[in-house]
């Protein structure tokens, strides 16, 4: 049995749906929102790699590496901002972050 593109797209759709539901169902915890965004980016990368291997082109795989790099930087910067915010405010709830408007 061969794993076709439909299998990859199904897994990618499930990951994307989990990420979107994670954002909409849990709006109070910033860390869960960041993890949900990472799930969405992972599903996009899986689509890039699946279509790239299906079409025999390496552009999708190279673009997936760029997206992974940007996602890692986004996660590192987001977590660093959350650590500083937690040290200053004592909480990382989304309601407290919205108060920080400058």
From Swiss-Prot:
Major place of residence: membrane
Gene Ontology molecular function: NADH:ubiquinone reductase (non-electrogenic) activity; quinone binding
Keywords, comma-separated and alphabetical: Cell inner membrane, Cell membrane, Membrane, NAD, Quinone, Translocase, Transmembrane, Transmembrane helix, Transport, Ubiquinone
Enzyme's top EC category: translocase
Reaction(s) the record says it catalyses: a quinone + NADH + 5 H(+)(in) = a quinol + NAD(+) + 4 H(+)(out)
Membrane-spanning residues: 5-25, 31-51, 66-86
Bilayer disposition of the protein: Multi-pass membrane protein
Gene3D superfamilies membership: 1.10.287.3510
Residues annotated as signal peptide: none
GO biological process, alphabetically ordered: ATP synthesis coupled electron transport
Any one Pfam family match given in the protein's UniProt record, by short name: Oxidored_q2
Any single Gene Ontology cellular-component annotation: plasma membrane
UniProt superkingdom: Bacteria
Entry EC no(s): 7.1.1.-
Subcellular localization: Cell inner membrane
Alphabetical list of InterPro entries matching this protein: NADH_UbQ_OxRdtase_chain4L/K, NUOK/Mnh_C1-like
Function of the molecule: NDH-1 shuttles electrons from NADH, via FMN and iron-sulfur (Fe-S) centers, to quinones in the respiratory chain. The immediate electron acceptor for the enzyme in this species is believed to be ubiquinone. Couples the redox reaction to proton translocation (for every two electrons transferred, four hydrogen ions are translocated across the cytoplasmic membrane), and thus conserves the redox energy in a proton gradient.
Record note on quaternary structure: NDH-1 is composed of 14 different subunits. Subunits NuoA, H, J, K, L, M, N constitute the membrane sector of the complex.
UniProt similarity note: Belongs to the complex I subunit 4L family.
Stated name of the protein: NADH-quinone oxidoreductase subunit K
Organism of origin: Brucella canis (strain ATCC 23365 / NCTC 10854 / RM-666)
Lineage of source species: Bacteria, Pseudomonadati, Pseudomonadota, Alphaproteobacteria, Hyphomicrobiales
